[in-house]
Amino acid sequence: MDVTTILGREPAMYIGGSWVGADETRPVINPADESVIATVPEADAGHAEQALEAARRAQRAWGRKSGPERGTVLKAVAAAVRANKEELARLVVAEQGKTITEARGEVGDAVPGFFAYYATFERAQVGAMFAPDEANEQLFVRSVPYGVVVGIIPWNYP
């Protein structure tokens, strides 16, 4: 999907595998010329609940995957970002007013680098041994995917 297609589509949120609209929208302003480059939906509490429930459903299957399987998915995301870096960089330029060089650095190096790093993170997090209270005990803690985390944060970037 190219930038023109992304910017020209009806405002919607991707929740649980489907595009979901909203009653309210807001413009995305190009800081370079103050033109409206897109319109985005304004999520409400109902959308947040939908997203949370979709994430809970997805997490059950995700939690059953092995660390290497989860890593394969994250590596694929990194590869997809790299493969589409020019289109993504153009979106960053239009939305944030960054130079194309800065935007390419983010989507060509930084973002895929984060995904690639976390793709191998599971191998480093194998667990921990602790000294037991009794001589005939062994205490081992194993990290596993536990559940869904919701974070709603103000995003004021750059």
Region spans (language model):
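Short glycine- and Lys/Arg-enriched binding-loop motifs that mark or flank ligand-binding interfaces
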Residues: M13, V93, R123, S143, ...
